[in-house]
Structure formats: structure tokens, C-alpha cells
Amino acid sequence: MDGGFFLCPDAWEFLLPAEICHLRDAGSVCRKRWDLLTLTPMGCALLPEPAAVTAAILLLPGACPRSDLRAGTVVTYGLSPRDSITLSSLREPMLCVQRTLPLLCGGVLEPQEFPLPGVEGAERLLPGVGTRLLWTGSPYPL
């Protein structure tokens, strides 16, 4: 399987499964069809328009205005109730899966919540935690 994360902040690399490539330039994002591709808000903004981006599963911010990105399944993250992956509480961070999502490891993930104890600024971690969740079925590093 091929997974990529465009412009992943270095501080989040510990969240990523070893098989996920940290993509640092737009050319690497467009070079092939990804099984899972994650875009940060900055990644959405820096991709040229139109971008030749294709993925089986595309994880991107719910606020990303792009319509030129192609995916079998688009999964959004953010703090909106429309986003597939969000937080149900900011005081005691709780990762919330709002709808049934396909997993790269096989099967599906049903709507549920995962506690994120001791995590400050959890909303900034949604892309990293979401990538791990879609790849492995768990938001937690093993």
C-alpha cells in the first residue's frame, strides 16, 4: 500500500505509521495514485490548480475548497459537525468518528469516540491522528 502525507509537520511524524511517506513538495503528491493521501490546510493551499491528485482515500480539511482532487472516498477532518473526523470535546480531547469509514488495513470503522488523554491542542493533531486511524484502525501509536 502507498500512503502519503503532504506537508506533515515534523512534530507529528511520531503519529504516522512507518509506511506513510512524508511528502514535502507538490510534485511528489501528483506522481502516482495513492491508497491514502493526507493534506494539511497548507498542503491544500500550496497544490497547484488543477492538481493531478488521485487517491483511494483522501483525508483533507473540511474547509478545503478544492474540487479538482480525485478520490474513491473523501474523508474530512476539522471541528465542523459535517467533518467525518472531529473532536467531540476540546476540554477532555475525544476523537470522534462521525460516520462509517473504510480502513486501509481492511474493513470499516464504525462511528465511535477515542479518548486522547494528555493531548493539548488536539484539533491541530487531527490530520496525523486521522491518518493513523485510517491506516491502522487505531489512533494510537503502537
Give residue spans per PLM region.
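Residue-level signal for functionally critical sites in structured catalytic/ligand-binding pockets
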Residues: G4-F5, E13, V29, L46-P48, ...
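Adenine nucleotide phosphate-binding catalytic loops in nucleotide-utilizing enzymes
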Residues: L79-L142
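Generic preference for hydrophobic/aromatic residues in regular secondary structure cores
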Residues: F5, A18-L23, T38, L95-V97, ...
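Flexible active-site lid/hinge loop adjacent to a nucleotide/diphosphate
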Residues: E13-T76
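Walker A (P-loop) phosphate-binding motif
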Residues: M1-I20, L142
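Surface-exposed beta-strand edges and flanking loops
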Residues: L7-P9, H22, L59, L87-S89, ...
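Residues that cap or initiate secondary-structure elements
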Residues: A11, G43, A63-R66, S80, ...
